[in-house]
C-alpha cells in the first residue's frame, strides 16, 4: 500500500489563496508561494506519485498562534497544491479526508499523509 508523508509550510486560507478581479479568479501571491513550496518539497524528496488511485488524506494544521481559525479554510489550498505538484491527478480522488488542529508552533505548518484508499 502506497503512503507518503509531507511536512509543509503553513497554508494560506481559501480566502487568501484565491482572489478575484471582475469576473477573473486567480491565485494570490501567497497562494503561489505555497504552491511552489509544495512542488519543491515533492521534487526534492522524490515523492512517489499516486496517479488516479482513490486516496485517503489526513492533514494536521499546526497554527502559528493560539488564535482560533476555521479548520477547513486551508484544506483546499493544500489539496490543490498537492495536485498541481503531481502527487495525484485530481482532488476528486480523495475518498476520505481527516483534518486535525494541533498546538500552535512558531511559524506554523502542516503535516499531510496521503495513502491509497481501501474501503472496509
PLM segments and residue spans:
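Acidic, proline/glycine-enriched N-terminal capping motif
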Residues: 1-120
